[in-house]
């Protein structure tokens, strides 16, 4: 303090009045009132910082920091007091009224603090009076008008902390979330378990019903067979009761099996019928001591009806193709498409409604012991010489193009000669076998008969399923002739009943157009356009080859957007450029797919694709129909085609293009169709006789 007073006495210090000191004798508190902003501060360092930060523009400090040495002015206060005073201040960071706070070394009302404050106040007051009297007078006037209140209402005391609830800790929140999620998980598990039980209960009920029905039907069939009548008498000779049992070994040694030609394949068919009557108890059989016999499990008695030897089967024989050399899967597809379009064929022949149903074939030998099933079996065919036909599994699948009629006739003759030669060889071997084989009616002793009856007590084997595999199916030949009959009926119904003079009558059969479309679509692998289920009739390798070909065609078709987009086709404006695009597209298709298609055939294929795609879009998006997997696959190949915008339909006979199918069909029907009635004078065609007669009367003035 002495250094500070020495500076004051020299008179070289420029002082500015910044505030007044306010004292509360009752509470022993001292505060400083800012002269510029009228704020009150309880600590001198805080007041000094306030002056430096808030009123530096008026006071014009020469240094930025520590203008006044707070350590020299208030040596008793430490830095901790400054921090605490700033924290307890209720005003802003640079001003405000602070609460009560104790000094670090002693209380504010101690003698040392009061002495220091009195000396500072006296020095400042004396300096203010001597230097600036006017400021002192104005200050006294303002102080007299607003005397400081002796009470402590103007000072803000430190607030007492209220009762604040302790917030939950992180561990409590985590445990709460865990318990809540666990409760939800348990509720979901209970709900799912109840739903699962209901589903399993419904499935068990659905499965148990057909089982009960099957058991009831089997029980009823067995009861009906038992009540229907006594079992049939066996055709075996009666047992010889007088024969002795000891003759069994000798008879077995003397009996030799019939000798057959080992090179000849044969199948022995036996019909074994078990008797339903219970087996009577009989005495033990006495056997020779020199021969060891093992006990054999005994069942019901068995009667052997007859033993037949079937004719040999030539599996390597090739199938006889039709005159047009069409693979069997093509005939099936044609017949299926023809059945889907009865209105186009105009057939009225009701003699043949449906092809005969294929008999069901067993995959393995099954044991059947019930008599009603035996009664329902068809009669076995006789072992007569019959023209052999190869089974369906041995047919050769061909996907090549249709050959010329000359090659087809040549291959038909070769196959016929090969078939006739194989039939002659089979007949010769069969006659030789019949001469060499022994009769199965050799005489058996009573012991042998008893041994056979006691040991061969097995259930009946269903060998008729093997016999059906050797029999040719009439439905195979029927499917090949079905299309020819339909074509004949269509041509008969489509031909006019009367022939008129000066008329050109020419009606193209619908089946011919259908076959032509199938040939074109088969070349590009798009048979699905005519038959959506054609892949079900083909093996996997054949269907995969069709899909690869269709993928190549669609990839090429996608690059020529001026062909399938009507907007771009319309902007071209010149038919010559469109014709050039079609020609280049045809050349690229022929080069990539290795075929020989003309521009008109390409136009026909594109028209079929556009018509099929528009129909499938209508079925899927507007009629909400479910499409098959194969149709979905082929639709994805042509996903770039417009679905709602108009597409391009090309006339196959001229260079006209149309935005929709209706205009295209109308153009073809009116301009390029072959009508039944054509005028010989002007060449105009008419669909019906009425319009033709009207034309003759009005234009050519003929009665």
Swiss-Prot record:
Native source species: Drosophila persimilis
Comp. bias regions, Polar residues: 84-94, 339-352, 364-373
Biased composition (Basic and acidic residues): 148-161
Function: Specifically required in males for proper segregation of autosomal bivalents at meiosis I. Expression is required in the male germ line prior to spermatocyte stage S4. May have a role as a bridging molecule maintaining adhesion to hold autosome bivalents together via heterochromatic connections.
Chief localization: nucleus
Additional comment: Drosophilid specific gene duplication generates rgr and tef. Teflon has a function unique to Drosophilids.
Residues passing through the membrane, by range: none
BP terms from Gene Ontology: male meiosis chromosome separation
Ribonucleoprotein found in the keyword field: no
GO molecular-function term, one example from the UniProt record: zinc ion binding
Keywords of this entry: Cell cycle, Chromosome, Chromosome partition, Meiosis, Metal-binding, Nucleus, Repeat, Zinc, Zinc-finger
Subcellular location: Nucleus; Chromosome
SMART domains: ZnF_C2H2
ZnF (C2H2-type) ranges: 32-55, 649-672, 677-700
Protein name per UniProt: Protein teflon
């Amino acid at each position: 303090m002495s250094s500070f007073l020495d500076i004051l006495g020299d008179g070289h210090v420029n002082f500015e009045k910044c505030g007044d000191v306010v004292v509360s004798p009752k509470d022993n508190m001292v505060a400083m009132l800012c002269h510029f902003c009228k704020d009150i501060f309880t600590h001198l360092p805080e007041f000094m910082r306030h002056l430096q930060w808030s009123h530096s523009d008026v006071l014009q400090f020469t240094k930025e920091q520590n203008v006044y040495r707070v350590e020299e002015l208030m040596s008793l206060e430490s830095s901790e007091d400054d921090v605490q005073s700033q924290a307890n201040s209720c005003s802003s960071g640079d001003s405000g009224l602070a609460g009560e706070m104790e000094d670090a070394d002693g209380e504010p009302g101690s003698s040392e603090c009061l002495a220091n404050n009195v000396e500072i106040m006296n020095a400042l007051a004396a300096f203010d009076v001597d230097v600036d009297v006017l400021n002192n007078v104005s200050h006294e006037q303002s102080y007299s008008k607003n005397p400081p209140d002796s009470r402590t209402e103007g000072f803000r005391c430190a607030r007492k902390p209220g009762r604040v609830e302790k917030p939950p800790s992180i561990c409590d929140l985590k445990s709460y979330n865990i318990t809540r999620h666990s409760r939800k998980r348990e509720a979901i598990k209970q709900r799912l378990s109840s739903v699962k039980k209901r589903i399993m209960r419904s499935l068990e009920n659905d499965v148990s019903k057909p089982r009960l029905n099957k058991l009831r039907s089997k029980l009823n069939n067995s009861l009906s067979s038992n009540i229907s009548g006594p079992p049939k008498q066996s055709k075996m000779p009666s047992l010889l009761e007088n024969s002795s049992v000891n003759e069994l070994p000798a008879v077995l040694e003397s009996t030799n099996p019939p000798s057959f030609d080992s090179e000849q394949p044969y199948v022995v068919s036996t019909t074994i019928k078990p008797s339903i009557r219970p087996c009577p108890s009989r005495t033990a059989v006495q056997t020779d001591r020199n021969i060891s016999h093992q006990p054999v499990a005994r069942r019901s008695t068995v009667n052997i009806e007859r033993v037949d030897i079937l004719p040999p089967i030539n599996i390597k024989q090739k199938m006889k193709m039709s005159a047009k050399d069409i693979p069997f899967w093509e005939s099936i597809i044609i017949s299926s498409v023809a059945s889907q379009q009865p209105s186009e064929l105009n057939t009225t022949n009701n003699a043949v409604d449906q092809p005969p149903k294929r008999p069901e074939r067993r995959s393995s030998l099954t044991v059947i012991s019930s008599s009603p099933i035996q009664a329902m079996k068809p009669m076995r065919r006789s072992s007569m010489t019959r023209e052999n036909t190869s089974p369906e599994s041995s047919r050769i699948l061909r996907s090549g193009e249709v050959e010329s009629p000359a090659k087809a006739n040549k291959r038909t003759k070769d196959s016929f000669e090969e078939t006739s030669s194989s039939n002659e060889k089979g007949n010769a071997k069969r006659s030789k076998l019949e001469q060499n084989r022994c009769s199965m009616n050799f005489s058996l002793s009573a012991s042998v008969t008893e041994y056979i009856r006691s040991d061969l007590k097995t259930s009946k084997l269903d060998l008729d399923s093997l016999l059906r595999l050797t029999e040719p199916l009439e439905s195979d030949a029927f499917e090949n002739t079905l299309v020819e009959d339909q074509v004949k009926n269509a041509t008969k119904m489509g031909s006019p009943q009367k022939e008129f003079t000066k008329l050109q009558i020419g009606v193209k059969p619908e089946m011919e157009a259908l076959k032509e479309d199938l040939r074109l679509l088969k070349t590009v692998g798009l048979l699905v356009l005519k038959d959506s289920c054609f892949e079900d009739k083909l093996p996997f390798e054949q269907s995969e080859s069709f899909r690869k070909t269709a993928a190549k065609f669609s990839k090429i078709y996608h690059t020529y957007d001026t062909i399938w987009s009507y907007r771009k086709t319309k902007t071209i404006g010149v038919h010559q450029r469109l014709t050039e695009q079609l020609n280049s597209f045809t050349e690229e298709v022929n080069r990539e797919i290795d075929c020989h298609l003309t521009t008109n055939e390409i136009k026909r294929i594109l028209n079929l694709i556009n018509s099929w795609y528009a129909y499938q879009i209508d079925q899927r998006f507007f009629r909400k129909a479910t499409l098959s997997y194969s149709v979905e696959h082929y639709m994805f190949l042509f996903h770039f085609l417009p679905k709602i915008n108009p597409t391009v339909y090309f006339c196959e006979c001229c260079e006209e293009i149309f935005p929709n199918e209706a205009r295209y069909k109308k153009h073809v029907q009116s301009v390029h169709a072959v009508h039944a009635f054509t005028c010989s004078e002007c060449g105009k065609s008419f669909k019906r006789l009425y319009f033709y007669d009207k034309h003759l009367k009005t234009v050519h003035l003929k009665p």
